[in-house]
Amino acid sequence: MKNFVIFLIRLYQKYISPMKPRTCRFYPTCSQYSIEAISKYGLLKGGLMSIWRILRCNPFNPGGYDPVK
């Protein structure tokens, strides 16, 4: 299941993301962060970390460097 979710994120990175303007305020991007978090911590914890990251990626947050810890 973990690999399938990562596969879906990679599809998003390859086919959907290039059609949209760059809006992620963080480095690495939210999709790359999600892949790293799910790979390192598994689907449940990594997924929750990804959701929290995506919720923080908005105009009211300055963003910046935020690696998976």
From Swiss-Prot:
Database matches in InterPro entries:
Membr_insert_effic_factor_YidD
Q: Which UniProt keywords apply?
A: Cell membrane, Membrane
- Cellular component per GO? plasma membrane
Topology in membrane: Peripheral membrane protein
- Entry's transmembrane regions: none
Q: Does the keyword Membrane apply?
A: yes
Q: Where in the cell is it found?
A: Cell membrane
Q: Which SMART domains match?
A: Haemolytic
Entry similarity comment = Belongs to the UPF0161 family.
Function recorded in the entry: Could be involved in insertion of integral membrane proteins into the membrane.
Matching PANTHER family: MEMBRANE PROTEIN INSERTION EFFICIENCY FACTOR-RELATED (PTHR33383:SF1)
Q: What is this protein called?
A: Putative membrane protein insertion efficiency factor
